[in-house]
């Protein structure tokens, strides 16, 4: 069973490397699972452009989903990079991303706890209570009265999303 069989892991990796990069990952899993290979070998095996293979491998490496080892050729002195996927780490990385998202959503929920007002005439942009009070609840653009904006639905959606993410982390 491959780590890519997990829909969440597949989606996470796809988000990182895109469709073309995903093809590189799939070919590596299919053709050279658990083996060290050069980027040139991956390009040759997969039929994918060498620059795209390298870009994908570097992105995976930066996200701790691939590793490499360097070997120096004794005759030429050139360095050869041997790459290997390490997708076992993907679930851990996905959990870290979920924790970051929870923090971001909690900050957004805190912001949404403010009171907002909107202009009836202008394009509906929200104005914080403090600024609305400074302008005597009159739109600074067209001088029409500001109306209270009820963001209860947004706050509830944020709470639901945070709860869902926390439940998924608890599993």
From Swiss-Prot:
Q: Which UniProt keywords apply?
A: DNA-binding, Transcription, Transcription regulation
Report the domain of life of the source organism.
Archaea
Question: Is DNA-binding a UniProt keyword of this protein?
Answer: yes
Q: Which GO terms describe its molecular function?
A: DNA binding
A Pfam family recorded for this sequence: TFIIE_alpha
Let me see what the UniProt entry remarks about domains: The winged helix domain is involved in binding to DNA in the preinitiation complex.
Q: What does this protein do?
A: Transcription factor that plays a role in the activation of archaeal genes transcribed by RNA polymerase. Facilitates transcription initiation by enhancing TATA-box recognition by TATA-box-binding protein (Tbp), and transcription factor B (Tfb) and RNA polymerase recruitment. Not absolutely required for transcription in vitro, but particularly important in cases where Tbp or Tfb function is not optimal. It dynamically alters the nucleic acid-binding properties of RNA polymerases by stabilizing the initiation complex and destabilizing elongation complexes.
Protein name stated in the entry? Transcription factor E
Please give the organism: Methanocella arvoryzae (strain DSM 22066 / NBRC 105507 / MRE50)
Q: Which gene encodes it?
A: tfe
